[in-house]
Amino acid sequence: MIITTHKQFPNYKRYEIEYEGRPLVMETGKLAELCNSAVLVSYGETTVLVTCTASARPKDGVDYFPLSVDFNEKLYAVGRIPGSFMRREGKPSLPAVLASRLIDRPMRPLFPSDLRNDVIIACEVLSVDRDCSPEITAMIGASAAVSISDVPFNGPIAGIVLGWDGEKYLFNPTQEQRKTNRMTTTIAATHKKIVMIESEADQVPDDVMYEGIVQAHAHLQPVLDLIDKMVSEIGKP
């Protein structure tokens, strides 16, 4: 684990670990300082800015938790410029909407059931490495951003993609490995338990799936430990 600071930004912190063969870096204190918290997370060459903002007072007249998770894709993240006359981005794509739900699902139950303040988690994709999932990167960043904020949260969580090629398990498989993949399972978990599983598979035996989930949970622990380290050093009360 590597932790560094910056002279020009007194609140700047940089945390780095190796996650499934690729560097996972989380930086705070440099961007979006007016939010409750902000984390710039990079996994390989994939970079996502995640911000967490909460209202100061509970929202009137609601009997639910008003949480919004926005996963914003930009064409410049893959080196393209919109070709339309207006040069504007369109509405969120279906994969972006599904990515927002992927992050929302494991996090929502970990907030207090009586919380009525507006909470917005915005994930802005800045660059994409096709070997490193921006959805998983955003999920880790969202967990870190909420954990170090002053919003009550019973986390952290971390995410991983579990694959299987018929012989061995693949954790956060690369684009080349996904070509022979017989199973793609996205798993989110806390230190103690699995909180979300989303899977598509081609006739994978139950025992293979179960053992893969157990191993994936173990592979998540370094990321959770890193977020705990961030909370202990820069977390808001």
Predicted regions and their residues:
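Small-residue-enriched alpha-helical segments and adjacent helix-cap loops
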Residues: 82, 86-88, 98, 102, ...
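Mobile "lid/hinge" segments at catalytic clefts and subdomain interfaces of large enzymes
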Residues: 152-237
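Catalytic cores of large soluble enzymes that bind and process phosphate-bearing ligands
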Residues: 7, 15-16, 23, 61, ...
